Amino acid sequence: MFTSPRLLVPLLLASCWVGWPVTSHGTTIDLDRLIRCLEAREGARWASPGGALQFTKATWSELSSDPYLRASQPDKARQIARKALFLTIQRMERDGIRPTVWLLALRWNCGYSGMLARRLEPWSYAENVHNLYYDNDFR
């Protein structure tokens, strides 16, 4: 069965927004679990500027047409976080980089160019998120 790339991209974007796991290079990354780990690592309250995921105004504006105040609303912020992570995975694949939880956490903390510059260095933020992702039981 032939699937047009024009149909495939919206389907993939929709899958990331509804919370389905994303598979890249044979590795499945559960974006909802990763977002929970990012929330835990950031340690901010939802009522704080940028919400629990600590969006900057610039990042929020790149990803959403909604007002920055919506970054403090959990459902909307998680939707935009899934979009950000999914777009990062796509960009990494285009750049020949195999996406991992550690690299996605590094990108969340440092931005894409920061991730590229630091991806071969130890980075406690990324290590902490990686450990939460694989070792924490979110019950």
Indicate residue ranges for each PLM-predicted region.
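N-terminal targeting signals for Sec/Tat export/insertion, comprising classic cleavable signal peptides
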Residues: 36-62
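Alpha-helical segment that forms one wall of the substrate-binding/catalytic cleft
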Residues: 62-103, 107-115, 130-132
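Solvent-exposed, acidic/flexible segments
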Residues: 27-31, 45-53, 70-78, 97-101, ...
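A charged, solvent-exposed segment within the mature domains of Sec-exported extracytoplasmic proteins
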Residues: 114-139
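Bacterial N-terminal signal peptides that target proteins for export
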Residues: 1-9
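Boundary at the C-terminal end of the N-terminal hydrophobic targeting segment
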Residues: 21-26
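Bacterial N-terminal signal peptides
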Residues: 9-19
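Short, functionally critical alpha-helical segments immediately adjacent to catalytic or ligand/cofactor-binding
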Residues: 28-45, 81-82, 103-112
